[in-house]
Regions:
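Conserved small/polar residues in nucleotide/adenosyl-binding loops
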Residues: 188-192
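N-terminal alpha-helical transmembrane segments of multi-pass membrane transport
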Residues: 1-98
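Transmembrane-helix bundle segments that line or gate the permeation/cavity pathway
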Residues: 80-116, 123, 132-158, 186
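Loop-to-transmembrane boundary segments
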Residues: 170-186
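Membrane-water interface regions at transmembrane-helix termini and the short interhelical loops
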Residues: 28-29, 52-65, 120-130, 147, ...
Length: 192
């Protein structure tokens, strides 16, 4: 198993999440909310991880199905673990497991929530919650593949691990271009 490449890809994915965590900071600044500070800690940790292990690509850079499965599983867990931190740090969801549930619900677009009054959240947290649903709607890993532009062979193994069903072999060769088109359409039609 190519653990160096797994670490490299995961750190690049976490680097993407660190950038996404900075968007609610801008929203907080626009609405003059102090709770936006809660996004800086996880974003800083993720940026540090990215610069420690996600910048230099390992010499042995091939991955196969087994590595793809490990990367997909760990990516879902790590994105949710770090994505839950702002809810807990801000104090609006003090129980970390509840915040984790809320974030997993967003990234998987299940629609479940532990919040009784979602609108009571500050705008930056409400934006982050909505962003997790938006990203999850198209698939976290497809989104990251579009942004990180891994080589086609490695992307194929990650896509096969992410996409369910027997038709995934037909999807994979054109998945990157299809995903870019879909995200372009989604951005164009979003009322964000």
């Amino acid at each position: 198993m190519n653990t160096k490449m797994i670490r490299y890809i995961l750190c690049r994915m976490l680097g993407v999440e660190s950038v996404l965590l900075m968007i609610p900071v801008i929203v907080a600044a626009l609405y003059q909310e102090m709770s936006g500070i809660a996004f800086l800690i996880p974003a800083g940790i993720l940026l540090l991880l990215f610069f420690l292990a996600g910048v230099k690509k390992p010499e042995q850079s091939h991955i196969y199905g087994k590595e793809g499965m490990v990367i997909v599983a760990l990516a879902w867990i790590l994105w949710s673990l770090f994505g839950a931190m702002p809810f807990t740090i801000s104090g609006f969801i003090p129980n970390y497991m509840d915040a984790f549930f809320e974030t997993v619900s967003g990234f998987t677009t299940t629609g479940s929530s532990i919040l009784r009054d979602v609108e009571a959240l500050p705008q930056c947290l409400l934006f982050w919650r909505s962003l997790t649903h938006w990203i999850g709607g198209m698939g976290v890993l497809v989104f990251v593949l579009v942004l990180t532009s891994l080589d086609k062979k490695n992307s194929m193994y990650l896509m096969r691990a992410e996409v369910p069903g027997p038709e995934k072999d037909k999807l994979v060769p054109k998945a990157m271009s299809t995903a870019r088109i879909l995200y372009g359409c989604l951005l164009y039609t979003s009322d964000a």
